[in-house]
Amino acid sequence: MYYPEPIARLIESFSKLPGIGQKTATRLAFYTIGMEDQDVNEFAKNLLSAKRDLSFCSICGNLTESDPCAICTDPTRDRTTILVVEESKDVLAMEKIREYRGLYHVLHGTISPMNGISPDEINVKTLITRLMDSEVKEVIIATNATSDGEATAMYLARMIKPAGIKVTRLARGLAVGSDIEYADEITLSKAVENRLEI
């Protein structure tokens, strides 16, 4: 189907987002074009601001406006526990439940032998270094319940246990193959509460 070039480029841009197919990208493009100029400008400004003003915390790897992040510098946090997640959006999901008061570590992915992703390509080395220089007594592995998430959890457990640090995994209220960000708050709360030692 023919679209004027500006619309075609906008559709292409939207379709690059995860989970957005051609139909949804087309709907979003036409919706955006129909928005008030002020709303489009605000949307563009917010998008550029997020891209420009956010970076990764040098300690935990979470998205932040300042380095180190607010969680890492919060003196009320339990510094003896680190919860390891795949992505920054998982930190947001865990924070919503208000059940966990320790620190985080964001891997920015998982080990995936099928996709050629090794431990060196995710944020593992900084976790190991961080554990050696801290008072951490427990690492809770909260990777997703997928084959790559499981492989990553097992690898991390093998790397961390020799240091004498307790390694636990979220309990299974989470469906196999599901992502943490989509779990409801009660399920996540119970998964943290009933975590299992690996």
Swiss-Prot record:
Alphabetical UniProt keywords: DNA damage, DNA recombination, DNA repair, Metal-binding, Zinc, Zinc-finger
Coiled coil: none
Domain of life: Bacteria
Limits of the Toprim domain: 80-175
SUPFAM superfamilies, per database record: Recombination protein RecR
Family membership noted in the UniProt record: Belongs to the RecR family.
Protein name according to UniProt: Recombination protein RecR
Organism of this sequence: Lactococcus lactis subsp. lactis (strain IL1403)
Gene that produces this protein: recR
